[in-house]
A protein has these predicted regions:
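Membrane-embedded helix-loop-helix hairpins and adjacent transmembrane boundary segments
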Residues: 1-564
Length: 564
């Protein structure tokens, strides 16, 4: 890092501080101000926040690493702007008119208090033990590699970077609430995009262009069926990404994440009205088309450079692991460290900071909101709005502490836990997705049906995760049908079958129990909206919204056709 890099980082920090100070000075009189930014966010802030919140360590390390190790396969999860459009066009009207703060609260409106509690517990545990922990852990690794510092003042630089990232982000999240998340995203998103674009351009320049990347990666097979790194659709016998499983599994996980998860939907709930919320999702969908090119393809570039350097008799581009293989997870930080000139490296570091801080801030705020609204306020409904804000700030502090305490565990088993993260999402998503999908699309879905769908998903998911831990450490143990279903079955196929099972549970239990009253589900399910509510929704979009939606869908289709 040169002096010019530090100057660029300093300017970024000053701009960030300026925004945070302005946000903190704004009055936050009630919980809606603190957790939802006063429900007056515009489409630019919503779309930028959706994108910036989504881009975290799983992209800077995981997605680029996936590009370097397996090529295009993970693009199924990243070319999902179409799923954000479903959030905007299908779910925004129901979420907006319900005036809820959280997704568990919406399930209580649609089903019962037990459903709210189940989803709140699942969400809080998964946020603290997976999303917060992995973002912090990976953030420390990224900065250790980018700065090239092993120790500082006798302390492992990993700890300085990880703890510093958490504390700085926590400070502005605690005092600024949702507004700090939204408005810092407006600054952070363009910096992240610009920094990543520079890496893409310089990477292609060093390698020799797109054709050279496709030539090198297209010559590398990734399975016994002969599929190469450049192929998105792979044999159904592929052990990791069978094409049918990838299409079904990525859709289920994407639906859960983009349309029902508090972490994302909270940005839409902060919208001024349906129009701003929907346009925010359209803007976010445009931005979501970019990660494949900004993170996954740079990972493929890093792999191609590694192969090219080795072919020329050099030592390779990527650092090597102890087992003699290239460290794919180091792809993105290695590109930053080796290719970028002074000043530009500082800008890209700002982009990395922006991604990690925005993602962490969103996690802190969403977790605090879940605790405050779904637990504290439920048991103390007469709590004043100002006290709820204080409780939210205190909850954020607790979540920060839990995240910090989890870092040593993450570091000791980081590689193993990171490998299981996709497995965690694949078993977390089906039950929740089934409860929301049928709850909004089918009037006959009963409170007991939705609740038992959630319970079935939770029990099956925990069984799968427990089996993964047991059998992976037990050696070659015979397990019969149980072992095949809960350990050996491809995680994407398991996700699909689990979703189908949860759908069946919801339907069967609903038909066996009392149907919900019209008053209970009015405005929350298709076919129950009043003429006034339908007119409000119709007035919230025009032909330009449709045109942009069609453009996004067209780009998505073209991508699949090109990499088929």
């Amino acid at each position: 890092m040169e002096a010019l890099d530090w100057i660029v980082i300093g300017v970024f920090a000053l701009a960030l501080i300026g925004i945070i100070v302005w946000v903190v000075k704004q009055k936050q009189n009630d919980s809606a101000d603190y957790f939802l930014g006063g429900r007056d966010a515009t489409w630019i802030a919503i779309g930028a926040s959706i994108f910036a919140s989504n881009i975290g360590s799983e992209h800077l390390i995981g997605l680029a690493g996936a590009g370097a190790s397996s090529g295009m396969a993970m693009a199924h999860w990243e070319i999902q702007g179409w799923m954000i459009l479903i959030l905007g066009w299908v779910f925004v009207p129901f979420y907006s008119r319900s005036m809820v703060y959280t997704m568990p609260e919406f399930l209580e409106r649609r089903y019962n208090p037990q459903s709210r509690t189940i989803l709140s517990v699942i969400s809080l545990i998964s946020y603290v033990l997976t999303k917060v922990a992995v973002t912090v852990y990976a953030g420390g690794l990224v900065f250790q590699q980018v700065f090239g510092i092993e120790e500082l003042w006798g302390i492992d630089f990993f700890w300085i970077a990880a703890i510093g990232l958490v504390l700085i982000t926590a400070l502005y999240t605690i005092f600024g609430g949702m507004k700090s998340v939204l408005y810092t995203s407006v600054l952070q998103t363009p910096i992240l995009l610009l920094g990543s674009l520079i890496i893409l351009v310089l990477g292609f320049k060093e390698l020799g262009g797109w054709d050279e990347m496709m030539r090198i990666c297209g010559a590398v097979t990734v399975n016994d069926q002969g599929n190469t790194m450049t192929e998105l659709i792979r044999s159904n016998s592929d052990p990791n990404f069978p094409w049918l499983g990838a299409l079904i599994g990525s859709a289920i996980i994407g639906f859960w994440y983009w349309c029902t998860d508090q972490f994302i939907v909270q940005r839409v709930l902060s919208g001024k009205n349906q129009k701003e919320a929907r346009r925010g999702t359209i803007f976010g969908a445009y931005l979501k088309l970019l990660p494949v090119f900004l993170f996954l393809i740079p990972g493929m570039i890093a792999f191609a450079l590694h192969q090219k350097y080795l072919g020329a008799g050099g030592e390779g581009f990527l650092p090597m692991l102890a087992n003699g293989s290239a460290n794919a997870d180091a792809a993105f930080p290695t590109l930053v460290a080796k290719l970028l000139p002074a000043g530009v490296k500082g800008l890209v570091v700002c982009g990395i900071l922006a991604a990690l801080m925005s993602s962490l801030a969103s996690l802190f705020n969403s977790s605090a909101m879940l605790f405050t609204i779904d637990f504290y306020k439920r048991f103390k409904p007469k709590t004043s709005e100002k006290k709820l804000v204080v409780i939210g700030q205190m909850a954020t502090v607790v979540i920060v502490i839990l995240g910090l305490l989890w870092i040593p565990i993450m570091r000791s088993v980081g590689d193993v836990l990171y490998t299981y993260l996709q497995d965690v999402q694949s078993v977390l998503a089906p039950g929740i997705a089934a409860a929301f999908l049928l709850g909004i699309c089918w009037k006959r879905t009963s409170a007991q049906g939705g609740m038992w769908g959630l319970i079935a998903g939770m029990v099956i998911g925990l069984t799968r995760l427990g089996a993964k831990v047991y059998y992976s450490n037990a050696g070659d143990v015979a397990g019969g049908t149980f072992k095949y279903l809960f350990y050996d079955m491809n995680w994407l196929f398991f996700c699909g079958w689990m979703f189908l099972f949860c759908i069946i549970v919801v339907i069967v239990v609903s038909l066996a129990t009392k149907a919900p009253s019209e008053e209970k589900i009015q405005g929350l399910v298709f076919g129950t909206s009043t003429p006034a509510q339908l007119a409000e929704t119709r007035a919230s979009w025009n032909h330009w919204d449709i045109i942009h939606t069609v453009i996004i869908l067209g780009i998505t289709a073209a991508f699949y056709i090109y990499f088929w």
